[in-house]
Amino acid sequence: MNENLFASFAAPTILGLPAAVLIILFPPLLVPTSKHLINNRLITTQQWLIQLTSKQMMTMHSTKGRTWSLMLVSLIIFITTTNLLGLLPHSFTPTTQLSMNLAMAIPLWAGAVVMGFRFKTKNALAHFLPQGTPTPLIPMLVIIETISLLIQPMALAVRLTANITAGHLLMHLIGSATLALSTINLPYALIIFTILILLTILEIAVALIQAYVFTLLVSLYLHDNT
Protein backbone atom coordinates (compact mmCIF):
# COMPACT_ATOMS: atom_id res chain seq x y z
CA MET A 1 0.00 0.00 0.00
CA ASN A 2 1.38 3.41 -0.96
CA GLU A 3 1.70 5.89 1.84
CA ASN A 4 -0.05 9.21 1.43
CA LEU A 5 2.50 11.88 0.49
CA PHE A 6 0.95 14.29 2.95
CA ALA A 7 0.77 11.81 5.84
CA SER A 8 3.95 13.24 7.35
CA PHE A 9 2.31 16.66 7.60
CA ALA A 10 -0.61 15.41 9.72
CA ALA A 11 -0.43 16.44 13.36
CA PRO A 12 0.65 13.42 15.45
CA THR A 13 -1.10 12.32 18.62
CA ILE A 14 0.08 10.63 21.80
CA LEU A 15 -2.59 8.56 23.56
CA GLY A 16 -5.20 10.43 21.56
CA LEU A 17 -3.89 13.85 22.58
CA PRO A 18 -2.28 16.28 20.09
CA ALA A 19 1.50 16.19 20.37
CA ALA A 20 2.01 19.48 18.50
CA VAL A 21 2.27 21.42 21.76
CA LEU A 22 5.09 19.22 23.07
CA ILE A 23 6.87 19.36 19.71
CA ILE A 24 6.63 23.15 19.54
CA LEU A 25 7.99 23.50 23.09
CA PHE A 26 10.90 21.12 22.41
CA PRO A 27 13.24 23.45 20.37
CA PRO A 28 14.19 25.62 23.39
CA LEU A 29 15.79 22.52 24.90
CA LEU A 30 18.26 22.52 21.98
CA VAL A 31 19.52 26.00 22.91
CA PRO A 32 21.13 25.45 26.33
CA THR A 33 22.20 28.23 28.66
CA SER A 34 25.49 28.11 30.53
CA LYS A 35 25.64 28.14 34.35
CA HIS A 36 29.42 28.46 34.45
CA LEU A 37 31.59 31.56 34.49
CA ILE A 38 33.58 30.38 31.44
CA ASN A 39 31.48 29.11 28.54
CA ASN A 40 32.33 26.01 26.53
CA ARG A 41 32.70 26.00 22.75
CA LEU A 42 29.05 25.19 22.09
CA ILE A 43 27.75 28.07 24.20
CA THR A 44 30.38 30.44 22.79
CA THR A 45 29.42 29.55 19.21
CA GLN A 46 25.75 29.91 20.07
CA GLN A 47 26.27 33.37 21.56
CA TRP A 48 28.40 34.45 18.59
CA LEU A 49 25.70 33.42 16.12
CA ILE A 50 23.02 35.20 18.16
CA GLN A 51 25.06 38.39 18.33
CA LEU A 52 25.82 38.23 14.59
CA THR A 53 22.15 37.75 13.72
CA SER A 54 21.03 40.47 16.10
CA LYS A 55 23.54 42.96 14.70
CA GLN A 56 22.53 42.11 11.12
CA MET A 57 18.84 42.78 11.76
CA MET A 58 19.14 45.67 14.21
CA THR A 59 21.54 47.86 12.19
CA MET A 60 18.73 49.66 10.36
CA HIS A 61 16.58 50.19 13.46
CA SER A 62 16.39 53.25 15.65
CA THR A 63 16.98 53.10 19.39
CA LYS A 64 13.28 52.47 19.95
CA GLY A 65 13.17 49.71 17.36
CA ARG A 66 16.12 47.90 18.93
CA THR A 67 13.99 47.05 21.93
CA TRP A 68 12.52 44.31 19.71
CA SER A 69 15.89 42.56 19.29
CA LEU A 70 15.20 39.87 21.90
CA MET A 71 11.88 38.98 20.28
CA LEU A 72 13.42 38.80 16.79
CA VAL A 73 16.34 36.64 17.95
CA SER A 74 13.95 34.32 19.78
CA LEU A 75 11.81 34.10 16.64
CA ILE A 76 14.66 33.14 14.32
CA ILE A 77 16.00 30.57 16.80
CA PHE A 78 12.56 29.01 17.18
CA ILE A 79 11.87 28.79 13.43
CA THR A 80 15.37 27.51 12.67
CA THR A 81 15.30 24.71 15.25
CA THR A 82 11.74 23.76 14.28
CA ASN A 83 12.67 23.55 10.59
CA LEU A 84 15.80 21.51 11.30
CA LEU A 85 13.98 19.09 13.59
CA GLY A 86 11.52 18.44 10.78
CA LEU A 87 14.33 17.03 8.63
CA LEU A 88 14.73 14.08 10.99
CA PRO A 89 13.10 10.86 9.71
CA HIS A 90 9.53 10.20 10.87
CA SER A 91 9.32 13.60 12.54
CA PHE A 92 6.70 16.33 12.37
CA THR A 93 7.44 19.86 11.19
CA PRO A 94 5.08 22.44 12.74
CA THR A 95 6.14 25.06 10.17
CA THR A 96 4.47 23.03 7.41
CA GLN A 97 1.14 23.97 8.99
CA LEU A 98 -0.28 27.20 7.57
CA SER A 99 -2.30 27.74 10.74
CA MET A 100 0.83 27.87 12.89
CA ASN A 101 2.67 30.19 10.52
CA LEU A 102 -0.34 32.50 10.39
CA ALA A 103 -0.44 32.43 14.18
CA MET A 104 3.13 33.75 14.17
CA ALA A 105 2.78 36.19 11.27
CA ILE A 106 -0.52 37.92 12.05
CA PRO A 107 0.24 39.10 15.63
CA LEU A 108 3.72 40.32 14.68
CA TRP A 109 2.43 42.15 11.59
CA ALA A 110 -0.58 43.56 13.43
CA GLY A 111 1.59 44.79 16.29
CA ALA A 112 3.92 46.59 13.88
CA VAL A 113 1.03 48.19 11.98
CA VAL A 114 -0.75 49.31 15.15
CA MET A 115 2.48 50.85 16.42
CA GLY A 116 2.90 52.67 13.13
CA PHE A 117 -0.59 54.16 13.19
CA ARG A 118 -0.22 55.10 16.85
CA PHE A 119 3.24 56.70 16.87
CA LYS A 120 3.76 57.60 13.18
CA THR A 121 0.26 58.30 11.96
CA LYS A 122 1.25 60.63 9.10
CA ASN A 123 3.96 58.32 7.80
CA ALA A 124 1.68 55.29 8.04
CA LEU A 125 -1.07 57.02 6.08
CA ALA A 126 1.45 58.35 3.55
CA HIS A 127 2.29 54.77 2.54
CA PHE A 128 -1.18 54.44 1.04
CA LEU A 129 -0.52 57.22 -1.49
CA PRO A 130 2.93 57.56 -3.10
CA GLN A 131 4.13 61.08 -3.71
CA GLY A 132 3.39 62.54 -7.15
CA THR A 133 0.45 60.23 -7.89
CA PRO A 134 -1.89 61.60 -10.60
CA THR A 135 -5.27 62.62 -9.20
CA PRO A 136 -7.36 60.15 -11.29
CA LEU A 137 -5.27 57.23 -9.96
CA ILE A 138 -5.55 58.13 -6.27
CA PRO A 139 -8.61 55.93 -5.44
CA MET A 140 -7.14 52.93 -7.26
CA LEU A 141 -3.72 53.28 -5.63
CA VAL A 142 -5.23 53.59 -2.16
CA ILE A 143 -7.13 50.34 -2.71
CA ILE A 144 -4.03 48.59 -4.09
CA GLU A 145 -1.82 49.75 -1.22
CA THR A 146 -4.46 48.70 1.32
CA ILE A 147 -4.67 45.22 -0.20
CA SER A 148 -0.87 44.92 -0.31
CA LEU A 149 -0.73 45.85 3.37
CA LEU A 150 -3.38 43.31 4.37
CA ILE A 151 -1.79 40.41 2.49
CA GLN A 152 1.62 40.86 4.13
CA PRO A 153 1.00 38.33 6.94
CA MET A 154 -0.49 35.85 4.47
CA ALA A 155 2.59 36.20 2.25
CA LEU A 156 4.85 35.62 5.26
CA ALA A 157 3.03 32.45 6.29
CA VAL A 158 2.51 31.02 2.80
CA ARG A 159 6.17 31.57 1.83
CA LEU A 160 7.42 29.61 4.84
CA THR A 161 4.79 26.87 4.50
CA ALA A 162 5.30 26.37 0.76
CA ASN A 163 9.09 26.19 0.86
CA ILE A 164 9.26 23.77 3.79
CA THR A 165 6.42 21.58 2.46
CA ALA A 166 7.84 21.39 -1.07
CA GLY A 167 11.24 20.31 0.22
CA HIS A 168 9.76 17.61 2.43
CA LEU A 169 7.63 16.24 -0.42
CA LEU A 170 10.63 16.10 -2.75
CA MET A 171 12.72 14.30 -0.14
CA HIS A 172 9.86 11.84 0.43
CA LEU A 173 9.55 11.09 -3.30
CA ILE A 174 13.29 10.62 -3.83
CA GLY A 175 13.55 8.51 -0.66
CA SER A 176 10.70 6.27 -1.85
CA ALA A 177 12.38 5.91 -5.25
CA THR A 178 15.64 4.91 -3.56
CA LEU A 179 13.93 2.18 -1.55
CA ALA A 180 12.05 0.90 -4.59
CA LEU A 181 15.17 0.72 -6.77
CA SER A 182 17.32 -0.86 -4.05
CA THR A 183 15.76 -4.27 -4.79
CA ILE A 184 15.64 -3.78 -8.57
CA ASN A 185 18.76 -1.93 -9.68
CA LEU A 186 21.34 -1.19 -7.00
CA PRO A 187 23.60 1.15 -9.08
CA TYR A 188 20.66 3.42 -9.92
CA ALA A 189 19.57 3.30 -6.28
CA LEU A 190 23.01 4.50 -5.18
CA ILE A 191 22.86 7.38 -7.67
CA ILE A 192 19.45 8.46 -6.41
CA PHE A 193 20.64 8.06 -2.81
CA THR A 194 23.50 10.45 -3.59
CA ILE A 195 20.94 12.91 -4.96
CA LEU A 196 18.94 12.47 -1.75
CA ILE A 197 21.99 13.37 0.35
CA LEU A 198 22.61 16.49 -1.73
CA LEU A 199 18.94 17.41 -1.45
CA THR A 200 19.10 17.00 2.32
CA ILE A 201 22.02 19.44 2.46
CA LEU A 202 20.01 21.83 0.30
CA GLU A 203 17.00 21.50 2.60
CA ILE A 204 19.16 22.34 5.62
CA ALA A 205 20.16 25.53 3.82
CA VAL A 206 16.51 26.23 2.94
CA ALA A 207 15.49 25.75 6.58
CA LEU A 208 18.07 28.32 7.69
CA ILE A 209 17.31 30.76 4.88
CA GLN A 210 13.54 30.65 5.38
CA ALA A 211 13.91 31.32 9.10
CA TYR A 212 16.14 34.29 8.31
CA VAL A 213 13.79 35.63 5.61
CA PHE A 214 10.73 35.36 7.86
CA THR A 215 12.47 37.18 10.71
CA LEU A 216 14.03 39.78 8.41
CA LEU A 217 10.65 40.68 6.90
CA VAL A 218 9.16 41.07 10.37
CA SER A 219 12.13 43.29 11.21
CA LEU A 220 11.45 45.39 8.09
CA TYR A 221 7.79 45.79 9.09
CA LEU A 222 8.92 46.99 12.51
CA HIS A 223 11.45 49.34 10.91
CA ASP A 224 8.76 50.94 8.75
CA ASN A 225 6.52 51.55 11.76
CA THR A 226 8.92 52.52 14.58
Curated annotation (Swiss-Prot):
<keyword id="KW-1133">Transmembrane helix</keyword>
<comment type="subunit">
    <text>Component of the ATP synthase complex composed at least of ATP5F1A/subunit alpha, ATP5F1B/subunit beta, ATP5MC1/subunit c (homooctomer), MT-ATP6/subunit a, MT-ATP8/subunit 8, ATP5ME/subunit e, ATP5MF/subunit f, ATP5MG/subunit g, ATP5MK/subunit k, ATP5MJ/subunit j, ATP5F1C/subunit gamma, ATP5F1D/subunit delta, ATP5F1E/subunit epsilon, ATP5PF/subunit F6, ATP5PB/subunit b, ATP5PD/subunit d, ATP5PO/subunit OSCP.</text>
</comment>
<feature type="transmembrane region" description="Helical">
    <location>
        <begin position="138"/>
        <end position="158"/>
    </location>
</feature>
<feature type="transmembrane region" description="Helical">
    <location>
        <begin position="97"/>
        <end position="117"/>
    </location>
</feature>
<keyword id="KW-0138">CF(0)</keyword>
<keyword id="KW-0406">Ion transport</keyword>
<dbReference type="InterPro" id="IPR045083">
    <property type="entry name" value="ATP_synth_F0_asu_bact/mt"/>
</dbReference>
<keyword id="KW-0999">Mitochondrion inner membrane</keyword>
<dbReference type="Pfam" id="PF00119">
    <property type="entry name" value="ATP-synt_A"/>
</dbReference>
<dbReference type="GO" id="GO:0015986">
    <property type="term" value="P:proton motive force-driven ATP synthesis"/>
</dbReference>
<keyword id="KW-0066">ATP synthesis</keyword>
<keyword id="KW-0812">Transmembrane</keyword>
<keyword id="KW-0496">Mitochondrion</keyword>
<comment type="similarity">
    <text>Belongs to the ATPase A chain family.</text>
</comment>
<feature type="transmembrane region" description="Helical">
    <location>
        <begin position="6"/>
        <end position="26"/>
    </location>
</feature>
<protein>
    <recommendedName>
        <fullName>ATP synthase F(0) complex subunit a</fullName>
    </recommendedName>
</protein>
<dbReference type="GO" id="GO:0015252">
    <property type="term" value="F:proton channel activity"/>
</dbReference>
<dbReference type="GO" id="GO:0046933">
    <property type="term" value="F:proton-transporting ATP synthase activity, rotational mechanism"/>
</dbReference>
<keyword id="KW-0472">Membrane</keyword>
<dbReference type="InterPro" id="IPR023011">
    <property type="entry name" value="ATP_synth_F0_asu_AS"/>
</dbReference>
<dbReference type="InterPro" id="IPR035908">
    <property type="entry name" value="F0_ATP_A_sf"/>
</dbReference>
<feature type="transmembrane region" description="Helical">
    <location>
        <begin position="189"/>
        <end position="209"/>
    </location>
</feature>
<dbReference type="GO" id="GO:0042776">
    <property type="term" value="P:proton motive force-driven mitochondrial ATP synthesis"/>
</dbReference>
<comment type="function">
    <text>Subunit a, of the mitochondrial membrane ATP synthase complex (F(1)F(0) ATP synthase or Complex V) that produces ATP from ADP in the presence of a proton gradient across the membrane which is generated by electron transport complexes of the respiratory chain. ATP synthase complex consist of a soluble F(1) head domain - the catalytic core - and a membrane F(1) domain - the membrane proton channel. These two domains are linked by a central stalk rotating inside the F(1) region and a stationary peripheral stalk.</text>
</comment>
<feature type="transmembrane region" description="Helical">
    <location>
        <begin position="68"/>
        <end position="88"/>
    </location>
</feature>
<dbReference type="GO" id="GO:0045259">
    <property type="term" value="C:proton-transporting ATP synthase complex"/>
</dbReference>
<feature type="transmembrane region" description="Helical">
    <location>
        <begin position="164"/>
        <end position="184"/>
    </location>
</feature>
<dbReference type="GO" id="GO:0005743">
    <property type="term" value="C:mitochondrial inner membrane"/>
</dbReference>
<keyword id="KW-0813">Transport</keyword>
<dbReference type="GO" id="GO:1902600">
    <property type="term" value="P:proton transmembrane transport"/>
</dbReference>
<keyword id="KW-0375">Hydrogen ion transport</keyword>
<dbReference type="InterPro" id="IPR000568">
    <property type="entry name" value="ATP_synth_F0_asu"/>
</dbReference>
